[in-house]
């Protein structure tokens, strides 16, 4: 349509309406790519700094575009935990394979510590509490339980001592790694030497696990 304004009047021809642009999903954007990018961001900037907005900026898309692939931040963090948990148990299982006793314990602990220090954001993701259904449905988490409990059964432990021993190892490894990452060990004692002595102490504790009083 042609607009011909009258010569004697101040008149501006209306601009033609712009056609509505259809949003096209970013090629190659998948849930797996988002979760991997979120894990990388956690390692680089810190777990608490992983947000949907920060992730959207990485892919140069609107925040709303991410909801096609994840249900929200909670879902993203759950997926990060499963990704990191799978990576971590792969390292641990490979380190423990073919080893028994103290050698297996030291290999397990070393792989745990190595992953925690190399991937602080991913490691932080593994510390969130997951619902029972998610844990049950995750092959990686089931494998984690199998490897961990297998290590401790070799010391002759049975329930409920098995669960108590798992908690002892987890709190020892996690506490040491958290303090080391924070630079909180101020004494001049060599960190590797202290770590090795902790493994010695844990091995002796597991070998001489206290008997429970009869119920």
Which residue stretches match the model-derived regions?
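Amphipathic alpha-helical segments used for helix-helix packing
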Residues: 113-135, 178-186
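Basic, helix-initiating cap at the start of DNA-binding domains
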Residues: 1-45, 54, 58, 74-78
